[in-house]
Design a protein with these regions (language model features):
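Structured beta-strand-rich core segments of catalytic domains in phosphoester-bond hydrolases
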Residues: 40, 45-117
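Residues that form generic nucleotide/phosphate-binding pockets
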Residues: 25, 83, 132
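Short, flexible loop segments at the rims of nucleotide/cofactor-binding pockets, characterized by
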Residues: 9-16, 83-84, 121-123
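N-terminal, active-site-proximal structural segment of metallo-dependent hydrolase catalytic domains
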Residues: 1-51, 55, 61-67
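Amphipathic coiled-coil/heptad-repeat helices and related helical stalk/stem segments
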Residues: 18-19, 90, 129
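A long, amphipathic alpha-helix that forms part
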Residues: 119-139
Length: 139
């Protein structure tokens, strides 16, 4: 990909976002790659949404209606990976698509929660994610 329009959007529920104009935005902006976070959508349902991208990679959380990420693309990536190394719950937080000379990462970073209940986990997630991105940068 020598030139590409890449958009990223935390949609807080892809079905809800479609009802609020996401489809119109996609049609007018015409991105080559669209990264979505907080999709809250099962992979089986995602294929029925009618999003006009021939290459769609969804990573759902184990818990229905929670979290989730996606990379939608006009061009077939060389490879796709979900998640990254480390001890992390199945929350569908990362999709990485490798294109010629470029990695596109759609990530939904965990919140440390009220009273910082998940702060320790968030700090570990951040450290693991930085290491993951550094490995991608070396490729």
């Amino acid at each position: 990909m020598s030139h590409a329009k890449i958009f990223s959007w935390n949609v807080n529920g892809v079905r809800s976002a479609l009802g609020k104009g996401l489809g119109d935005f996609i049609a007018s902006a015409d991105p080559d790659v669209l990264c979505l976070q907080e999709t809250k959508c099962e992979t089986a349902v995602a294929s029925t949404l009618g999003l006009a991208f021939p290459h769609q990679f969804w990573h759902e959380a184990e818990k229905k209606g929670y979290s989730g990420t996606a990379v939608l693309s006009k061009t077939a990536p060389l490879s796709v990976a979900t998640d990254f190394p480390g001890d992390h719950p199945p929350e569908g937080r990362v999709v990485t698509a490798e294109f010629n000379g470029l990695f596109v990462v759609s990530a939904y970073v965990p919140n440390s929660q009220r009273e910082l209940e998940r702060l320790d986990y968030r700090l570990q997630w951040d450290a693991d994610f930085r290491k993951y991105l550094a490995r991608l940068a070396k490729k």
